[in-house]
């Protein structure tokens, strides 16, 4: 369980499925604050979103077993717009991952899982 009073990084996505790129993003985010909230968008199930929240959560927890206590996973609505005002008290950062990680295709991973 994370401490709600401590600085926390936030990751928002579908995580369909959680893969090496997501893992690296998590680890880089964790370096920033020491704890991360992982928000799973509640998207309609289709070919691009074949996994329900509980399955996504289980896959993430399995991948992050070494980081237990440093993250929480929550289900959120299908957020499509992120709006903010002055940004008082928080940073908005893009974490640039290596090109080989950026080239990971969740679509290809889903196709391989279906074969």
Model-derived features with residue positions:
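Nucleotidyltransferase catalytic core that binds NTPs
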Residues: 1-115
């Amino acid at each position: 369980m994370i401490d709600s009073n401590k600085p926390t990084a936030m990751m928002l996505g579908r995580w369909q499925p959680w893969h090496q790129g997501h893992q690296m993003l998590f680890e880089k985010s964790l370096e920033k604050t020491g704890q991360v909230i992982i928000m799973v968008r509640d998207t309609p199930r289709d070919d691009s979103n074949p996994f329900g929240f509980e399955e996504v959560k289980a896959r993430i927890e399995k991948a992050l077993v070494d980081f237990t206590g440093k993250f929480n996973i929550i289900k959120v609505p299908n957020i499509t717009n992120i709006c903010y005002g002055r940004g008082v008290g928080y940073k908005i950062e893009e974490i640039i991952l290596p090109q080989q990680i950026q080239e990971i295709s969740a679509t290809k991973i889903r196709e391989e899982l279906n074969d």
